[in-house]
Amino acid sequence: IEKSSGNRSGKLLDIGCGAGHFLQAMKKTGWIVQGVDVSEKARKLVSNTFNLDVKSPLDWLSSDEKYDVVTCWHSLEHIHEPWVYLDKIRTHLNPEGVLVVALPNYNSTDAKRYGSGWAAYDTPRHLYHFTTESMEKIASSCGFSIQSMHKMNFDSFYVSILSARHMGKSFISGVLNGFISWLSAMFNREKCSSLIYIMK
């Protein structure tokens, strides 16, 4: 986050913050943090556990607060109209603000290996699925430019192991396919199971 934003501290918003561990970690490094989550249970958990401010999507959409960094860690694919959120995020970013989006990549080696059994399809919870090309198009249509892309190397193993389990395959086969996916991503990052997009 610090490398991507060029800031050691600032104001950060995490959309789809879940249990709040990322927010708490960033708070400990000196960031002012806020979360958004659709789950009232999650909002209460984060508030009670970490004493952090977490808004509902409706409350956030109606606010006008500005942030130096907005993060979406595997949350954009759960949103019915992700372009609406991206448009709103753009209005919430400071002039030099950064958007960080992590998404499953269905062009990955493990996605091709497992086909419809690929765990990261996660239907019906995942409403949209992205490639680097489709992400570039939606980002551009919402006024963003992708500055860089980064691999989430562990996801090659994690998603492969989950996929193997869902398909009744062995744990070892999941690890092996995860290794193959990880190795292929070493030579071509667009083969990685999940990618992080840094946008401005």
List each language-model region with its residue ranges.
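Short glycine/proline- and charge-enriched loop/turn segments
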Residues: 114-123, 162-169
